[in-house]
């Protein structure tokens, strides 16, 4: 009986020591060192690369949630556990400032982008001059043009603004395929569901199945800017450190590689 009791005691002691080692080890600590970033869908490729780079250099896990800026901003306003928010326009950051959900002193315009017209890579459409003479209906041939939903998606709002200024909105509006975010609009063209789409130039840069067939004059839409800010109730040291990293030279190189303008 004593032998059995001794074995049980040894097993308990060994398990306890193992637990103590785990909870005090750097590996365990790393599991608790993380930062959660809510970011516009158009930043997916660039931020994923930056996140991987950051994890290699720091004892911190970076978790991303990518979607339309409008969707994410509403989630943050409702208390979603984000540490950092990066929007594809100033409007949705203003929304969070008004809701007192972000640290206004940490707000900074991080990036810039441009707007392009895309087609599937093998499309017979090669070049479109984007002005008031463009016959959208003829170009679409009974199909629809993919855009982020102008009612709430920044890319769609920029697209609407450009089309309005080029006197094309009235013809275009009934022919739109409205997507939940800019990457969804890109996917519609990639999959052949729409012959044309309006996306950011950075989205076109990472897509292998599409080509740019037109570039919207930058005077036809408001500057496409990406502000970043710390989420107020979650402003941890990890969040502040990653925010600084996003504005540093290593991240800048990645953003530029993906075609973003860096401030």
Feature map (PLM): residue ranges:
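Exported/periplasmic ABC-transporter solute-binding proteins
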Residues: 29-57, 63-70, 74-80, 87-90, ...
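Bacterial N-terminal signal peptides
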Residues: 11-24
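Bacterial N-terminal signal peptides that target proteins for export
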Residues: 2-14
């Amino acid at each position: 009986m004593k032998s059995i009791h001794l074995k049980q005691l040894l097993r308990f002691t060994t398990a306890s020591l193992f637990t103590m080692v785990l909870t005090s080890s750097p590996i365990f600590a790393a599991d608790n060192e993380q930062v959660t970033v809510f970011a516009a869908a158009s930043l997916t490729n660039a931020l994923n690369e930056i996140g991987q780079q950051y994890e290699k250099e720091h004892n911190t896990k970076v978790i991303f949630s990518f979607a339309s800026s409008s969707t994410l901003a509403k989630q943050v306003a409702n208390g979603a556990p984000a540490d950092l928010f990066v929007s594809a326009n100033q409007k949705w950051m203003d929304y969070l400032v008004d809701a007192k959900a972000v640290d206004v002193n940490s707000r900074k315009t991080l990036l810039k982008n441009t707007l392009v017209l895309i087609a599937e890579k093998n499309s017979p459409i090669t070049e479109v001059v984007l002005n008031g003479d463009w016959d959208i209906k003829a170009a679409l041939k009974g199909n629809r043009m993919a855009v982020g939903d102008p009612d709430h998606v920044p890319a769609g709002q920029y697209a609407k603004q450009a089309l309005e200024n080029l006197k094309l909105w009235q013809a275009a509006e009934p022919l739109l395929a409205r997507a939940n975010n800019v990457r969804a609009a890109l996917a519609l063209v990639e999959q052949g569901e729409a012959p044309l789409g309006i996306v950011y130039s950075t989205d076109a840069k990472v897509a292998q199945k599409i080509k740019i067939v037109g570039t919207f004059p930058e005077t036809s839409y408001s500057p496409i800017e990406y502000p970043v800010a710390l989420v107020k109730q979650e402003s941890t040291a990890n969040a502040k450190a990653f925010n600084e990293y996003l504005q540093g030279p290593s991240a800048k190189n990645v953003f530029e590689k993906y075609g973003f303008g860096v401030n």
